[in-house]
Amino acid sequence: LPNELQRLEQALIQTRQQILEVQRKVGEVMGADDASIFDAHLLVLEDRTLLDEVTRVMAQKRISVEQAFGQVAEKYAKTLGAIDDDYLRERAADMRDVAARVLNNLLGRHEPGDLKHLKEPSIIISYDLSPSITAMFDKKKVLGFATDVGSKTSHTAIMARSLQIPAVV
């Protein structure tokens, strides 16, 4: 358990640095208001209730930190997704965005949604896009996108509007 907790701590530090970098870039390109969206992402990393539950689940179920973090984060996301308020329901996407970053860092994977490989202007079709991925879109390469989930109040939609990228969410 101590090794798994140490790995989690390192992944949280790395994720925080990544989110701060996204926030900095968004602030430069879109302004402070849009960059403040990522304050909620940073708060997830500091949520003691969530982190304590991850520790408890690891100990009780004797599972890896990846499994425990994934299970707990998805439980929180489902809870948010079930709330009868559009704004709060959209925060489930934020939880999943942060969880994906943490899990990728635990697993040593590259950042999710890296579209630097696009060679020509494209329209992106996806089940979902996180706000942090959307914020990093190159307007010269991404002409627009469509997702199955989201709404006009989602952080992904806000990022698209700020970048002036047409989107159907």
Describe the role of every protein-language-model region.
Residues 1-169:
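Non-catalytic, soluble scaffold/interaction modules
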